[in-house]
């Protein structure tokens, strides 16, 4: 794959549902802060040429052993992504949530390769639960929907333009690839059959620890 890509690693969320005095992305997982599990995985990928960590200033010291740039988080996730993009110097950017510790090298490569063809791509899994709309309550076809994760790889200028448009519309994005959708670009979904965990509740951390202790995740 002929690609040089930046990583924007999001570490600015507060995580009220996690019920912890510190943001969940800095909670220890098997001996090191949660966010560093993702950072280590991306550092090993040769096409990731630049890493921007979006975090509060008082957490920057945690990343001092690593060659990274910093950006300040915003009020919304999309504000944090846009802040990170101001430090990006490459034409392609991969966005990853700091609360997603499991990063699979082959999947990052597949997502980025797909983005090269269409302008935007996101990691996805098939819906395994019954999904219903709320108003009115209706059962949705599981084969017609997908669960979206990170990484998401997008052309840097497309992502910037989509984020600016969302801000002008006062529109809150659900994920990064939706910024491309606002511009009429259909993101490619790369489906995974592996565990995709976003640490949201304390119980999630216990599950992640069990997985890391018994399997080679990366």
UniProtKB/Swiss-Prot annotation:
Its EC number(s): 2.7.7.60
Coiled-coil residue windows: none
CDD domains: CDP-ME_synthetase
Example of a GO biological process term: isopentenyl diphosphate biosynthetic process, methylerythritol 4-phosphate pathway
One Gene Ontology term of the molecular function aspect: 2-C-methyl-D-erythritol 4-phosphate cytidylyltransferase activity
General function of this protein: Catalyzes the formation of 4-diphosphocytidyl-2-C-methyl-D-erythritol from CTP and 2-C-methyl-D-erythritol 4-phosphate (MEP).
Family named by the database record: Belongs to the IspD/TarI cytidylyltransferase family. IspD subfamily.
Full protein name: 2-C-methyl-D-erythritol 4-phosphate cytidylyltransferase
Protein source organism: Chlamydia muridarum (strain MoPn / Nigg)
